[in-house]
């Protein structure tokens, strides 16, 4: 299954807030009507697990195959499979760029990476899924137009409080990864155990 490229508000109305997918919000009236309709129906356990999985996939902008691969890696790692899964996704380079406020969404961050604008430890990295690690330093290509774009994004989209695993130096346009993210700083409201259960027969 390919990465979703359709209307983002359609996904938001169905799955609620996904900050990585879009910063837009649906109109309250239509949104509340959809919520009322959905709450009046009995939802199966499979549907609940499916929707949690879809939240994760659309928020991080993954294909079905990519997400399944991350689940399989998480199962082989030490610790809670769900927590490891979220940590792996949060430490992707495109998500780090998004969480630093350098891009308004994860698709926007992915575009910066794909175009070769991002440096990790002074080396150009153009792979959005690149796994970042503690002590990595994230910078941008030294280009006035790019700096102006990043500054605008930071002014508009940098969160009031960065997650504690990240530090950002605005004058240098430099991000620093302090540690692996703690689960309480994950921006997406998700029940990761339901995602693991969904894939229990496939991973």
UniProtKB/Swiss-Prot annotation:
Keyword Ribosomal protein in annotation: yes
GO MF term set: rRNA binding; structural constituent of ribosome
Chain ranges of the S4 RNA-binding domain: 91-152
InterPro entries named among the record's database cross-references: Ribosomal_uS4, Ribosomal_uS4_bac-type, Ribosomal_uS4_CS, Ribosomal_uS4_N, S4_RNA-bd, S4_RNA-bd_sf
- Disulfide bond entries: none
Q: Where is this region: Disordered?
A: 18-42
Question: Superkingdom, according to UniProt?
Answer: Eukaryota
Query: TM segments?
Result: none
**Keyword Plastid found:** yes
Entry keyword set: Chloroplast, Plastid, Ribonucleoprotein, Ribosomal protein, RNA-binding, rRNA-binding
Q: Quote the Pfam families the UniProt record gives.
A: Ribosomal_S4 (PF00163), S4 (PF01479)
Biased amino acid composition, Polar residues: 33-42
Gene Ontology CC terms: chloroplast; small ribosomal subunit
Give the GO terms filed under biological process for this record.
ribosomal small subunit biogenesis; translation
Localization recorded for this chain is:
Plastid, Chloroplast
What CDD domains does the annotation carry?
Answer: S4 (cd00165)
Function of this protein?
Answer: One of the primary rRNA binding proteins, it binds directly to 16S rRNA where it nucleates assembly of the body of the 30S subunit.
Subunit annotation: Part of the 30S ribosomal subunit. Contacts protein S5. The interaction surface between S4 and S5 is involved in control of translational fidelity.
Which family is it part of? Belongs to the universal ribosomal protein uS4 family.
Q: What is this protein called?
A: Small ribosomal subunit protein uS4c
Source organism of the structure: Pinus koraiensis
Q: Which gene encodes it?
A: rps4
